[in-house]
């Protein structure tokens, strides 16, 4: 691992990053405002491992180009990432309060896409979360649902897409099979078939996912 790229400063996205950087002398990349917001939680990071990224600007690590794009979330300066290697493109888009034109444009023509499918709306509404937390998740800077993820995929799908990974699933307000079936049904209704040239899998919370080659 040559670098860590941080999307935003929430603790579930930075936990362990500081320890990893110190132990293996690995740089941490984030937007300037994100760095300011997370620096106390990371602990001491040597200056040469404090690195910045800028929205829509390329950051080159060896033979890989990383380009952040803006996302709406309740953080100071959150981003998703596009990762380019040769003609191949991998997109990472989680913690999306809602879908913007920037997100649509950024994840179009990806070979591999990791997309948030955070919750089932009925499970969330009927679940045990307090009202203010439900409102935060459902709000413009919260998280997108299985249905929203499916509709976005149907909208931006191209023949270049090979793998979809659904990620950032809520433990309490979603199930992997429910997220998969909801998204698969929306794609099928849009005449997009899974299982041949296009595959979809879940990004597991506590274990490694499938290894894919493009």
Residue map of PLM features:
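Divalent metal-coordination and catalytic microenvironments
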Residues: 8, 28, 66, 73, ...
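Active-site metal-binding motif and surrounding structural segment of the metallo-beta-lactamase
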Residues: 1-31
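Metallo-beta-lactamase
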Residues: 32-87
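Cap/insert and terminal regions of metallo-dependent hydrolase folds
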Residues: 101-201
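Short, basic/aromatic-enriched C-terminal tail that caps enzymatic domains
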Residues: 198-214
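Metal-dependent catalytic neighborhoods of phosphoester/phosphodiester hydrolases
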Residues: 15-24, 39-42, 174-181
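Active-site environment of divalent metal-dependent phosphoester hydrolases
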Residues: 10-14, 35-38, 75-76, 98-101, ...
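Structural motif
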Residues: 2-3, 88-90, 112, 163
């Amino acid at each position: 691992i040559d670098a860590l790229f941080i999307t935003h400063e929430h603790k579930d996205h930075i936990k362990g990053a500081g320890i990893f950087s110190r132990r293996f002398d690995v740089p941490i990349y984030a937007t300037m405002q994100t760095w300011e917001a997370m620096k106390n939680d990371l602990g001491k990071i040597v200056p040469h491992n404090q690195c910045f990224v800028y929205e829509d600007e390329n950051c080159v690590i060896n033979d890989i180009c990383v380009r952040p794009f803006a996302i709406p979330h309740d953080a100071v300066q959150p981003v998703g990432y596009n990762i380019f290697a040769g003609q191949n493109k991998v997109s990472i888009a989680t913690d999306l309060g809602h879908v913007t034109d920037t997100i649509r444009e950024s994840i179009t023509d990806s070979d591999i896409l990791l997309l948030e499918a955070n919750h089932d709306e009925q499970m969330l509404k009927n679940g045990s979360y307090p009202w203010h937390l439900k409102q935060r998740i459902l709000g413009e800077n919260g998280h997108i649902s299985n249905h929203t993820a499916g509709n976005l995929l149907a909208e931006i799908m191209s023949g270049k897409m090979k793998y979809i990974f659904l990620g950032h699933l809520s433990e309490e307000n979603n199930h992997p099979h429910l997220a998969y079936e909801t998204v698969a049904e929306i794609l099928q209704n849009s005449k997009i078939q899974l299982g041949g040239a296009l595959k979809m899998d879940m990004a597991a919370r506590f274990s490694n996912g499938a290894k894919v080659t493009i």
